[in-house]
């Protein structure tokens, strides 16, 4: 990237890196650290035409969320304005956008893919 003076870096964080979560201090801290590091690197590499951004998913339909008890899942879903879990495709489409030339003037940002659960 440095040699070509062009690049796109997209890191995956989590809604928990912005909100915290009971029993997940270590996870929340590591996801928040990715965001802070990405902002610093975005400043450092902007003049080299390298953009660095984050995608921060909320609750996404996956093997992990499939294990959540339905009553708990209903409570979580009720806290999402779009009233549903996201999909892996929602996340991958966001990564594809940030990796494209359409996002050439976006750097140091975090795009939240969470159905409106967190608007920060």
Residue ranges and their predicted role:
Residues 14:
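Residue(s) in the substrate-gating loop at a strand-loop-helix junction
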Residues 47, 59-80, 120:
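A glycine/serine/threonine-rich, flexible loop-to-helix segment
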Residues 43-47, 104:
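Alpha-helical segment proximal to the catalytic Tyr-Lys
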Residues 30, 38:
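Active-site helix of classical SDR
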Residues 19-22, 96, 107-120:
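Short C-terminal tail/terminal secondary-structure segment
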Residues 18, 35, 53-67:
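Short, flexible catalytic-loop segment of classical short-chain dehydrogenase/reductase
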Residues 10, 52-55, 65, 108, ...:
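Hydrophobic structural elements of the Rossmann-like NAD(P)H-binding subdomain
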Residues 54, 76-102, 106, 115:
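C-terminal helical subdomain
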């Amino acid at each position: 990237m440095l040699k070509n003076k062009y690049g796109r870096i997209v890191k995956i964080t989590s809604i928990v890196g912005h909100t915290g979560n009971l029993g997940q201090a270590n996870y929340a801290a590591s996801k928040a650290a990715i965001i802070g590091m990405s902002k610093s690197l975005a400043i450092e590499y902007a003049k080299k035409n390298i953009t660095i951004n984050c995608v921060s998913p909320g609750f996404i339909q996956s093997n992990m969320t499939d294990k959540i008890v339905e009553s708990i899942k209903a409570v979580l879903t009720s806290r999402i304005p779009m009233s549903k879990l996201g999909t892996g495709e929602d996340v991958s489409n966001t990564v594809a956008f940030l990796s494209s030339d359409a996002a050439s003037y976006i750097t140091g940002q975090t795009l939240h893919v969470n159905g409106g659960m967190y608007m920060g």
